[in-house]
Amino acid sequence: DFTGGIGVLNHGHNHPRILKARIDYQKQKKMEVHKNYFSPYVAVLGQNISQILPDDLNISYFPNSGAEAVEGAIKMAYKYHNGNRKSLLYADISFHGKLLGAASATGSPELSFDFPKIPNTYSFNYNNIDSVKKILNKLKKKNTSDVYAIIIEPFNASSLRNCSAEFLSELRLICSKEDIVLIFDEVYTGWSKTGELFYFMNFDLVPDILTYAKSFGGGKSSI
């Protein structure tokens, strides 16, 4: 993209429709959208997104970056279990961001820059369901899972590897059975980069949480 934000110019460089909408908004002297206060623009945006995603994905949270989206997803999954589960699973081939939680779930050690990780994170082999099952069995306590979330890129942009339909289908079944929050990170692959609006839409399954920030804004503020 010739900028510091890798993969953000999803809508082209200075697309005239986006520029016009931005200029018209400024001419009305409206304040920037502030997420600490109710905004009809944020409400309508969330409603519009819910109409293009599967029914189960009907609540939106709008952060500033892909890493913040992943941080929010991990926190929501942890809070879903009220802190009663302590373990997070991620793929050994992955990049989720450079913030503490996102970097803790990143499989490439050179991208975590030797910072400490959040506790109880475990990696499995990408696109290998037996590896997932092996770790899950180790982490069970009194036949109850200690895993609050599994995060994965269904299509890994860094390696150009993708998960098979069989792997994703069985992963979805396991997470549903064990009440584990399934997080799909499509920050790099979302918004039709793989043909479908999101890569997971090629398959008959839906994650519990989907991350797609960054290129969603087209490199502009307050899209």
Can you describe what each PLM-predicted range is?
Residues I151-A165, I180-F203:
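Conserved PLP phosphate-binding loop immediately N-terminal to the Schiff-base lysine helix
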Residues I18, M76-G83, A103-F113, F167-E170, ...:
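A glycine- and small-aliphatic-rich helix-loop capping segment at beta-alpha/alpha-beta transitions
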Residues L53, I174-C175:
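A generic structural signal for well-ordered alpha-helical segments
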Residues G46-A149:
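PLP-dependent aspartate aminotransferase-fold enzymes
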Residues R85, K177-I180:
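A short helix->loop->beta-strand "cap" motif at the edges of active sites that frequently abuts
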Residues D1-N82:
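Glycine-rich loop-to-alpha-helix module at the N-terminal edge of alpha/beta enzyme cores
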Residues L100-G101, D204-I223:
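Active-site PLP attachment segment
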